[in-house]
Amino acid sequence: MAPTTTATAAAEQAPPPQHTRKAVGLAAHDDSGHLTPIRISRRKTGDDDVAIKVLYCGICHSDLHTIKNEWRNAVYPVVAGHEITGVVTEVGKNVARFKAGDEVGVGCMVNTCGGCESCRDGCENYCSGGVVFTYNSVDRDGTRTYGGYSDAVVVSQRFVVRFPSSAGGGAGAALPLDSGAPLLCAGVTVYAPMRQHGLCEAGKHVGVVGLGGLGHVAVKFARAFGMRVTVISTSPVKRQEALERLGADGFIVSTNASEMKAAMGTMHGIINTASASTSMHSYLALLKPKGKMILVGLPEKPLQIPTFALVGGGKILAGSCMGSISETQEMIDFAAEHGVAADIELIGADEVNTAMERLAKGDVRYRFVVDIGNTLRSD
């Protein structure tokens, strides 16, 4: 049995108005990023809300950036986590899509304005009125949001997605709540742009830059689409992993000039998941005329854009951030049908700080998931 973490000695936070539901979480209180138990409050279940018992929560690299205040936007205490899966415990009177006992997930956002053009078009992840993120954000009622490193969340039904479950009696395939949790961020971050930009057509050739939390899921989706997929990495040691275990068709070491030259002009598209600053010129050279490269990573330094390579080849360089709720639900259903899930290391709540240290060193294959339901205790 996994070890447990309790909140017996944790400080009680003064609940905002209408935030009367008690919950327990793991919070960072300063830029050391060290997580300790804390008692927090959640709002009572509103008419359009879904209350969820959190069972699992994935650890995203953005969680690490935030708890350490590396983006200079942390408001402590921070209860991180936006790859949340669990079971519905209560629904509001206006909620018809969910019921108690349903297996569900919550991703990176929990509210938007609902009225701007992006929201009306079903692209709420680009809400011009401001996305309310699952944690370290300010909700419409002025309260701070706390994420999935906690035993319970209350979320508007608009931002909850259903997980196919064998317990539901349906004929379709189920998606595990533990290895499915990272899909709510890493999964939709690559799935949405692949679908939007036509990098989902069987027989076409797609490159995946980076073989980490996002990249390994991109490889799995590309294979499920029936595409030819080549991994592009700075790490030669990942060749065997990419080809033999993940089933990629090819592997290129990006610092190997001969390998890069041999692949020039062969790809219909590239999903670039790397966060390190990279050479756009060498990657664009891999594309066929009118090929597309989609950036989903956030480099630390501004990129140098080779305009002649873009214009001369009619190539497209685009960015993508997360995915909409409809895209997230579509992705979850597709993943269940095709057996796509993240490769995870399941950890107990008392192992989170060690996991963060390992994540900072890149020592994870490929995603940590916290077993909240079995290891985070309130007594």
UniProtKB/Swiss-Prot annotation:
The protein's assembly and partners: Homodimer.
Function: Involved in lignin biosynthesis. May catalyze the final step specific for the production of lignin monomers, like coniferyl alcohol, sinapyl alcohol and 4-coumaryl alcohol.
Gene: CAD7
Key words, A-Z: Lignin biosynthesis, Metal-binding, NADP, Oxidoreductase, Zinc
Chain positions recorded as Zn(2+) 1 binding sites: C60, H82, E83, C185
Positions that bind NADP(+): 62, 189, 210-215, 233-238, 273, 297, 320-322
Top-level taxon: Eukaryota
Reaction(s) this enzyme catalyzes, per UniProt: (E)-cinnamyl alcohol + NADP(+) = (E)-cinnamaldehyde + NADPH + H(+); (E)-coniferol + NADP(+) = (E)-coniferaldehyde + NADPH + H(+); (E)-sinapyl alcohol + NADP(+) = (E)-sinapaldehyde + NADPH + H(+); (E)-4-coumaroyl alcohol + NADP(+) = (E)-4-coumaraldehyde + NADPH + H(+)
Protein name: Cinnamyl alcohol dehydrogenase 7
CDD domains named among the record's database cross-references: CAD1
Pathway: Aromatic compound metabolism; phenylpropanoid biosynthesis
Example GO molecular function: coniferyl-alcohol dehydrogenase activity
Region of interest called Disordered, as start-end residue ranges on this chain: 1-21
Organism: Oryza sativa subsp. japonica
Swiss-Prot/TrEMBL cofactor(s): Zn(2+)
Cofactor note as given: Binds 2 Zn(2+) ions per subunit.
Gene3D superfamilies, sorted: Medium-chain alcohol dehydrogenases, catalytic domain, NAD(P)-binding Rossmann-like Domain
EC number: 1.1.1.195
Annotated positions binding Zn(2+) 2: C113, C116, C119, C127
